[in-house]
Amino acid sequence: MLLAQHGDRRIARLASLWDTPVASFETLVGGFEGKRFNSPNDIAVHTNGDLYFTDPPYGLDQGIEDPVKELDVHGVYRLTVGGSLTQVISDLPRPNGIAFSPDQGSLYVSNSGLPPVIMAYDVNPSGDLSNSRVFYQSWGDGLAIDQQGNVYVAGPDNGVLIISRAGELLGVLNTTQRTSNCAFGDDGYTLYITSDMHLLRIRLNVKGVGF
């Protein structure tokens, strides 16, 4: 299991068994160019094993004014299977959710700062990103993708937006409460949603990516 650990400001792997009374973790990466991360928030795993993750300041007690903050940039990073770390996005005020398209050719990143947008990037064979563009104009938090390429955006308007691969709004899953993330599970047809103090689930007629 991979974790973006806000408080410990690192990307880690669960190193202990599920039934271990006190969990232990292995740090995969904890900083960039000698400086600690702000507070890693979300992770997307490429089929080649590379990790892409966002690093906004939301886990710092005083946000951007916190004296423990070391990095000026709220970046998006790529950690290769071989352990090489690069910053692939540096111009988003608050990168948050992150997810790959079904063919791994596009990377989506939600920006929770101003302007509130969902960005899309081409993923080059080298692993670098290009062709930065606005995919959809909306505030968003966590992201999930189904096998048809539709993008599920948690966060706005007390629900989850469903946006087609062409960037058109298909509908909204109304939770009546603010949501923070969503992910496919079970047999792939179940979408789990974190919403305030609740964990919700809904059965869909399309599977999530990876199932």
Per-region residue spans from a language model:
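Short loop/turn segments immediately following the C-termini of beta-strands
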Residues: H6, P56-Y58, S112-G113, P156, ...
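A short loop-to-beta-strand structural motif that recurs across blades of beta-propeller domains
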Residues: R10-A12, H74-Y77, V117-M119, G159-L161, ...
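Beta-rich, blade/repeat-based domains predominating
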Residues: M1-Q5, F32-L51, E70-G75, V88-S106, ...
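Short, structured patches in soluble enzyme cores that scaffold and shape functional sites
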Residues: D55, T80, I89-L92, P102, ...
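Asp-box/WD-like beta-propeller blade repeats and closely related beta-sheet repeat scaffolds
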Residues: D8-P67, V73
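Beta-propeller fold detector
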Residues: A23-G30, T86-S90, L129-Q137, G171-T175, ...
